[in-house]
């Protein structure tokens, strides 16, 4: 009579072991779903904070790494309150790295050991500042590279300057009107710009040229335009940045002139800073820095083609 009892006890023990094993698996799966999901959400939240920090800090580059660090830390901790201060480094003058980490609690997973009481989640973001190789919303006014503020001279920005266009001496002018509909790698390929009228130039000044335009190409210089529309266009943009192509060379073919465009500058016309008559054409204002957010990454900053207009992109 003892044999059946022993067998029942043995079977009962096996059932208990089986149930415990099943419960362990079920709890493990629940931990994977609940805790794993929680940890992934924490990591995504942390990554968003790191991305925001890198993009914000990059706006201070290349001249102010201290300011970039302060801005990045502020943005990171605003977007994820309570996290430890991220580590901010600069691989080069135009790049900022933000490495952040925090802990996320375990709920069910902690039954498998104290190591799962909390887990460390990490995030890394890298933002890069570059010079746009293409520019949108460009005004049809080119400025000489020796007059535009270089990014390597930050004290130049905000200083009042007057730029002059003299049709009788285009090659020595510090600004010039451009035909933005034609550009080429060949210096004189665009020919005459006589088909571009004053109303068209006014529209480009007020609204910017609608297409992205390339640097490192030649553009035709527009002369003989109607004075009134140009003046009205400039008046409509007083106090707001105008994007000027920057030229370094002048070529000519007969009576036609061409500027070689190497980069982009942002210029703000001051109130009362417009003198645009038949023989006296001047603009008074200041150059400023500008961050373009809707352009692809471009060339190296702080070089000969960097005049303070930058684009910022997340590269990691």
Model-identified regions with their sequence ranges:
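Short amphipathic secondary-structure patches
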Residues: 2, 37-40, 44, 52-108, ...
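Alpha-helical assembly-interface signal, strongest on the long, hydrophobic N-terminal helix that forms
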Residues: 1-72, 154, 158
